[in-house]
Amino acid sequence: MAVTIQERRLTPEEYIEFLKRTDLGSQYPRERFRERIPRLLEKTSLSLAAVDETGKIVGVLMGLTDFAYWLFVTDLGVDRGCVRQGIGAQLMRKAHALAGGEKD
């Protein structure tokens, strides 16, 4: 499957819909879930989406970074129907490059 890795912030609706197709959502407490998700999406410093040919989001990576030395991946998920196709690895490579990569 061909995917494009996009640097973009997901809307709360997009992210919640994606969570239904992955096990990633199980990490979030149920209390005030819909209230907290917009803040999570707004405050993350790095947000990537893997999008297939039809425009469907099939992978997500979010993290915190200083864009110089460090990257902390907080969320990495792939659609259950698309696992074992290298999508997570593509997201990690793109995140590493955007966060500073190996420049030294």
Please report, for each region that a protein language model flagged, where it lies by residue.
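Short, basic/aromatic recognition patches
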Residues: R32-I37
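Short amphipathic alpha-helix that is part of the acyltransferase structural core
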Residues: M1-R30, T54
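Short, intrinsically disordered, charge-balanced linker/junction segments flanking boundaries
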Residues: G100-D104
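Short secondary-structure boundary/capping segments
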Residues: E7, P38-L40, A97
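A short helix-loop-beta-strand connector motif used in the catalytic cores of GNAT acetyltransferases and
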Residues: P38-A49
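Conserved acetyl-CoA-binding loop-helix of GNAT-fold acetyltransferases
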Residues: V78, R84-A97
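Conserved beta-strand in the GNAT
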Residues: A49, K56-L64, W70-F72, G77
